[in-house]
Amino acid sequence: MGYFEQKFLQLQKQKQGAFVPFVTLCDPNFDRSFEIICTLVDNGADALELGFPFSDPLLDGSVIQAANHRALNAGCSTKESFQLIAKVRSKYPDIPISLLLCANLIYAQTLDGFYQRCAEVGVDAVLVADIPLLASEPYIQSAQKYDIQPVFICPPNADETTLKAVAEKSKGYIYLVSRAGVTSAENQQSAKNLANLIKGLKKYGSAPILQGFGIAQPQQVKDVLKSGVAGAISGSAIVQIIEQNLTDREKCLSELAEFVQKMKQATLL
């Protein structure tokens, strides 16, 4: 049983949902990023979703794009990102870790080379954001070869065929997108058909569902959990705290700690 399955079972027994923060690795630099990730875990994060710095993050809003640029400007590439994950895994042997990234970063190292490195540093799951389901088989095969769980996005406009495919292919968890468009904490309008999507995924025996995009407040976490998903992912709101406190390390960490505590508190069912 993988770390994600173990965590979801544990939370279920404790009558809690999962709170999963997203950050870009090495934002604003390697050492600060490690401190930030430690702060997230120490204050209640149930799992981590981590992004690799990339120069053209098409799926991200301006907040995450800025995080990518800060990390790249600090001289952090894929090599440093893997080193940072290894450091996190060494400190937190049981925290589920997933990666969210674009296919180009994987191709630069070959499929097997990338997933092998993921296994070496302790990654549990990988979500390749820009690979359509129809083209996903080589990724799935390579991931499974190294015991990495392939994760897929369920888009807000998913039809029955897509729901079935996502439920069958996605392991560890499913990333349910709250709404169409780019990520941003400002835009908090949920897709109207979320309830049907959740029902459809569960009908096909899906992995636990984590809902993301635009989740920035504790009340949203409560609402998300009421809809039947296993937890919430928050990215832009966290990265915004980092961005607003680039010159004040202590304030950055204390604000992140407070934010995660509030969001985690909202997962108590």
Swiss-Prot record:
InterPro entries referenced in this protein's UniProt entry, alphabetically: Aldolase_TIM, RibuloseP-bd_barrel, Trp_synthase_alpha_AS, Trp_synthase_suA
Subunit structure: Tetramer of two alpha and two beta chains.
Family: Belongs to the TrpA family.
Reaction equation(s) it catalyzes: (1S,2R)-1-C-(indol-3-yl)glycerol 3-phosphate + L-serine = D-glyceraldehyde 3-phosphate + L-tryptophan + H2O
One annotated Gene Ontology cellular component of this protein: cytosol
One Pfam family matching this protein: Trp_syntA
Top-level division of the source organism's lineage: Bacteria
Record protein name field: Tryptophan synthase alpha chain
Pathway it works in: Amino-acid biosynthesis; L-tryptophan biosynthesis; L-tryptophan from chorismate: step 5/5
Single GO molecular function: tryptophan synthase activity
Annotated keywords: Amino-acid biosynthesis, Aromatic amino acid biosynthesis, Lyase, Tryptophan biosynthesis
NCBIfam families (UniProt xref): trpA
Annotated gene: trpA
Active site: E49 (proton acceptor), D60 (proton acceptor)
EC code: 4.2.1.20
Gene3D superfamilies: Aldolase class I (3.20.20.70)
Job description of the protein: The alpha subunit is responsible for the aldol cleavage of indoleglycerol phosphate to indole and glyceraldehyde 3-phosphate.
